[in-house]
Amino acid sequence: MASSEFIDPAKLDLDDQVVAINRITKVVKGGRRMRFAALVIVGDRKGHVGFGTGKAQEVPEAIRKAQAAAEKNLITVPIVGTTIPHEVIGVYGGGKIMLKPAVEGSGVAAGGAVRNVMDLAGVADVTSKRLGSNTPVNVVRATFEGLKQLKNAEEVAKLRGVSVDHLAE
């Protein structure tokens, strides 16, 4: 299972990717008040990935806040070779993401935010389908819900109380 135990971001060489920046307008008595919201994904391309959101009056500050939030929200993704261990569906709100393992060399068949998550997680071969909501925040959250459900063969064998060899039969 993709563990959500605390992962120290200082020990990892993290890259980041800004997925979305939204301008938010609040109408007040004196006119319109503008703010910005940023969605950022961070990862080390070796099985650790996280996402975060940040809001501020200026875009760079919103991105900085989102990066800090993403580093606090890291998960570990089990990777088998260059792909994920099994098919999974992640759901968050109206967003649904189906992730399927792919043969080596097929690449990341995913669009937008899902591709960014997979690249930063270090998954080189995967197929995905986005169902339902396609807003970037829902897509990223649904992708993370799916990644959290992943288990490798050792974890499944341990949960069932059998050997890994017995699972392959």
UniProtKB/Swiss-Prot annotation:
GO molecular function annotation: rRNA binding; structural constituent of ribosome
Gene Ontology CC: small ribosomal subunit
Quaternary structure and partners: Part of the 30S ribosomal subunit. Contacts proteins S4 and S8.
Entry keyword set: Ribonucleoprotein, Ribosomal protein, RNA-binding, rRNA-binding
Domain comment, as recorded: The N-terminal domain interacts with the head of the 30S subunit; the C-terminal domain interacts with the body and contacts protein S4. The interaction surface between S4 and S5 is involved in control of translational fidelity.
Alphabetical list of InterPro entries matching this protein: Ribosomal_Su5_D2-typ_SF, Ribosomal_uS5, Ribosomal_uS5_bac-type, Ribosomal_uS5_C, Ribosomal_uS5_N, Ribosomal_uS5_N_CS, Ribsml_uS5_D2-typ_fold_subgr
Family: Belongs to the universal ribosomal protein uS5 family.
A Pfam match: Ribosomal_S5
Domain S5 DRBM: from-to ranges: 14-77
Summary of the function given for this chain in its UniProt record: With S4 and S12 plays an important role in translational accuracy. Located at the back of the 30S subunit body where it stabilizes the conformation of the head with respect to the body.
Protein's GO biological process: translation
Keyword rRNA-binding applies: yes
Protein name per the record: Small ribosomal subunit protein uS5
